[in-house]
From Swiss-Prot:
It is a multi-pass membrane protein. Pathway: Glycan metabolism; osmoregulated periplasmic glucan (OPG) biosynthesis. Belongs to the acyltransferase 3 family. OpgC subfamily. GO terms for molecular function: acyltransferase activity, transferring groups other than amino-acyl groups; transferase activity, transferring one-carbon groups. Coiled coil: none annotated. GO terms for biological process: glucan biosynthetic process. It is found in: Cell membrane. GO terms for cellular component: plasma membrane. This is Glucans biosynthesis protein C. Necessary for the succinyl substitution of periplasmic glucans. Could catalyze the transfer of succinyl residues from the cytoplasmic side of the membrane to the nascent glucan backbones on the periplasmic side of the membrane.
Length: 385
């Protein structure tokens, strides 16, 4: 068992929680954006569309960097098999719990909201399976991807550790320019793979499980490994936590390119491939922007921050059906998009916190939505000697 730092990375905990909670305004703004979703407002809002695109352009890339960082930290703490078991439990159990309790009722609700309940019996067996794959995994996709990544990293992390034992890690030097070139190449490589699949067998790209297990994992795995490397090499971590005007400017320009691709790109042409290249490098640069900002403002411990760090996963899991309920049944009665957006935030966050407090008082639910066993504190006094 290898030693790990005793000091908790408070700013990384906070950033991870905020990125999770950003899913709430992201999905609520999606209702009022120009993007087609399960439910949409009568008229889209340009500013809420821009806000939605901004969150979507970088949020999950930074999230997976932090996940990789903490995953490697636990990798050094536990034996290999126990590490895999602990990690898979912590993400797999909440995912499997949320399917029958959250996404299945959500799917049934949407069938009636969108008027598709009557046509369901007429679908082919494959169409039913694929629809269920998309709808039941839904916003839980990142948990499935984390399970896949954890399994792959049983081998990858072992290789990294073995290579470190045979080399001097203090001599490893990183620069943002070098990383940018690497991630640009990774983005191009991903685009080539996707385009090849599109040419050879396009229907597979519409398969839900293939999209989650293969394509999403393939895109986000470099960020996950980057997080592990940031834990290993202090110089790399310092590169991300030190503010960089170059990264900020590059991220801003990349976001403009992202918006232009969204506006003028075509799904039948190269829009998705171009997006993968842009978001690969944009995600890297935003790691610096977010980490440096968080390190400066969020690197402290407080009861309020700890509360939302602990609550973030549960709140994220329950917010999605609440958001769709709001969009389907309440949004049509609010004429102002901005008022609807603010009401949606209050509605979803308020109910999510109430549900979180309720679930804390039910040990079984607390275990199922966290994947962590409920620890009973021993109050017995130590025997006298």
């Amino acid at each position: 068992m290898n030693p790990v730092p005793a000091q908790r990375e408070y700013f990384l905990d906070s950033i991870r929680a905020w990125l999770m909670l950003l899913g709430i305004p992201f999905h609520i703004s999606l209702i009022y954006s120009s993007h087609t979703w399960h439910v949409n407002s009568a008229e889209p809002s340009l500013w809420l569309t821009l806000f939605n695109d901004f969150i979507h352009s970088f949020r999950m890339q930074v999230f997976f960097v932090i996940s990789g960082y903490f995953s490697y930290m636990l990798f050094l703490r536990y034996p290999l098999k126990k590490w895999w078991k602990v990690r898979v439990k912590r993400v797999g159990i909440p995912m499997l719990t949320a399917i029958p309790l959250l996404t299945l009722p959500q799917f049934i609700m949407l069938q009636y909201v969108k008027g598709k309940a009557e046509s369901w019996p007429g679908l082919s067996l494959y169409d039913k399976y694929n629809t269920l794959a998309w709808e039941l995994i839904s916003h839980l996709w990142f948990l499935l991807v984390l399970v896949v990544m954890t399994t792959l990293c049983v081998w990858i992390f072992k290789r990294i550790r073995n290579n470190l034992e045979n080399s001097d890690k203090t001599n490893k030097k990183f620069s943002m320019v070098k990383l940018s070139v690497i991630f640009l190449c990774l983005g191009i490589g991903y685009a080539v793979i996707r385009r090849t699949i599109f040419i050879v067998y396009p229907p597979i790209l519409s398969n839900g499980m293939f999209n989650f297990i293969v394509m999403q994992t393939l895109f986000y795995l470099p960020f996950f490994i980057l997080g592990a490397l940031a834990f290993i090499f202090p110089h790399l971590k310092a590169l991300f936590t030190t503010p960089s005007r170059g990264c900020t400017l590059a991220a801003a320009l990349a976001f403009v390119a992202y918006l232009l691709n969204q506006r003028y790109g075509s799904g039948d042409a190269w829009m998705y491939e171009t997006e993968s290249v842009i978001t690969m490098v944009l995600g890297l640069w935003m790691v610096n922007v977010v980490f440096s900002f968080g390190h400066r403002l969020l690197n402290f411990q407080s009861a309020r921050v700890t509360y939302f760090v602990n609550a973030s996963l549960f709140i994220y899991l329950v917010h999605h059906p609440l958001t769709l309920f709001f969009g389907a049944y309440i949004t049509p009665h609010i004429t102002s998009n901005w008022l609807g957006f603010l009401c949606g935030l209050i509605f979803v966050v308020g109910i999510a916190i109430i549900l979180y407090e309720i679930h804390l008082r039910i040990p079984l639910l607390k275990f199922l939505f966290s994947g962590k066993p409920v620890v009973k504190r021993e109050n017995d006094k130590a025997p006298a000697r």
